[in-house]
Amino acid sequence: MPDKNLPRRAFLIQASAALGAGALAAFAPVQQAFAAQLNNLSVSAGGSDPFADLRQKYLLAPDVTYFNHGSIGTIPRMVQQARQGYLDLCETNPWLYMWSKPWDEARAHTRAIAAGFMGCGADEVVFTHNTTEAFSLLAGGLDLQAGDEVVFSSMNHSGASVAWFHYARTRGFSVRKFDFPIRDVPTLTADDIVALCRENLTDRTRVLVLPHIDNLVGLRHPLRKIADMAHSHGVEFVAVDGAQSVGMIPVNITNLGVDFYATSAHKWLQAPKGVGLLYMRKRAQASVRPIWVTWGQKSWAGSVQIFEDYGTRNLAEVLTLSDAIAFQKRLETQGAVQRKRALRDYVRQAVASRPNLTWRSPTEWDLASSLYSIGLQGRDSREVSRDMFQNHGYVFRPFHGDDWNTLRLSLNVFNTEKEIDRFFELLG
């Protein structure tokens, strides 16, 4: 007869122990099917655009030209199939696969894969739902009080900003946002950016928040230099919004010297929507209180898992993250990083030849990215975006207001020079 006093999680683990190895092996067919497709993935050696055939590996409608990976990515077919396989397996025995040992082991494997891809320890990686959630965990969990200050610039995305304002109202610390000279971005140097951050620190600044790559002009901040400067001037925590970087460029968080780094896997990692990652430097974890209150929390005391929402969630999405990462790593071996840079250079050359357009993004690659903005004269960027989508199937992000009228493009490896040529032809 079962012990009625045995905690639910302990009971589940105990009851499934004998089934563990066999149940875990049930994941193998899904993983093997994915691996077989991945091993056959290669860019074509022939033709003028060897990456063009990659589009067939995605689910995009044939009449859509997608230049908006910076807002939300699209999942490769094989990654989506793996996700469906995990979900189908879960539904064969929801109790076993949602709450028992096999799923725990598979989740630990995914955590290790994510940590390796980002250049940090598995005991420093928290599964979240998105970047905004990660900053809510930090703003709510750090012991910030009256007299403390959080600083960030106007380049900060709202998802990395609003939580600080919310908790400041209830706990009394201050939040200060300084103006970033966005119009000067094409001519800024790394030293200029570090100096700008330095000028806006005070002896009360405990937290500096900044994007790795911002979502307006795609400026790649020199994080190591900024983190070293900030720490040397008494800033306790450097927290980074990496939503636009992980999957777009190679990232090694340990080498960046930051304390927290959050990202969303639904953008450049091309993973299922609803999965995010938060790096918490080992020595910084003790400074953050968990804000989730859930059952069985004592089981994870002393572990980074204490910061996760362990209620019922779609764990198939979490497992698929490892497959999405494997897909991106495969593309890297095929020259994906160089491809994205080449597309950016091609767009920049097209802008330079048109007097009604202005390049608003960094000019040097060390500060640049696969997200870039084009200043537009004589037409409202919102109307241009609407017309280009409704009549021609182009998807990109317009920004308009405060004397800022731009088209933001964020291209990925399967986009082509032909699509770019057509874009500028339609733009006029």
Language-model regions, residue ranges each:
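Pyridoxal 5′-phosphate
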Residues: 2-7, 12-428
